[in-house]
Each structure stands twice: as structure tokens, then as C-alpha cells.
Amino acid sequence: GSDYLSSDPDFLIYQPVALGHHRSYDGTRGYPLSFDNTASPYRDAIDLIHICDCLDAATDYLSRNYHRAKPFDVVLNELKAGRGTEYNPDMVDVLLSDRELYNDLKMLTEQNRENIYYDIYLTFVNLRKKRQ
């Protein structure tokens, strides 16, 4: 992802987020080791994408054939357990306290994922057509 983003000037600003989103919140785990997410000016964005990526990967029942999808509530408990070490504690607190966000994320991760993926795909196809 980082290499792709660096090849397109319109997306270059997102490169640090793509590069650092596999690092833990406290910076002790993940990759690449050479990237210090704790000192990045994009830390909040990195932390948000880290949570989103983990949530997506853990609940994905379509394309992750190397594991079974977990229910949203199980993943939410894992986020809670990793609060402050693996995950940004403030962001986890929002996930735990905002009922509307909880309901939206539960629906997005457990229902209708196929249509969501297709809509995102069409958005990118149309964006690319406009740029040509």
C-alpha cells in the first residue's frame, strides 16, 4: 500500500498512514520496525486505520481464507483488552461508549459486506475513469 501511494502525487500524503498502520499503539510491536508511529504527525490517523484494519480483518467472512471470521462483539472485547498497548485508548473508549457507532459497525461487519465492497470498487473505478 505504501509503495502504491508514494507513486501517485494525489495520495502521497497518505503514505505514512499506510506505512504505520501495522504498528501497535505503544510502538512496541508490528512492522516496519524502522517506522516510529508514536512520533508521527499522523499518529491519530495511523491509530484509526490500525483499528479499522484489525476490525475488518477479524470480521471478514469473504476474503480471509486463513481464518474464520469473528463476531463483532468478540473483536470489540479484543480491542478493549488491547486498549492502551495495541490500540489507541481514546478510540477504543469511543467504540465502547457510542451506541450508534457500535450499531453501525456491527451492521457493517456482520451484514451486507458484499455490497459494501462492490460499492467501494465502483467508486474507485469511476474515480480512475475521471482521471484518464
What are these regions (language model features)?
Residues 1-132:
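Histidine- and acidic-residue-rich, metal-dependent catalytic cores
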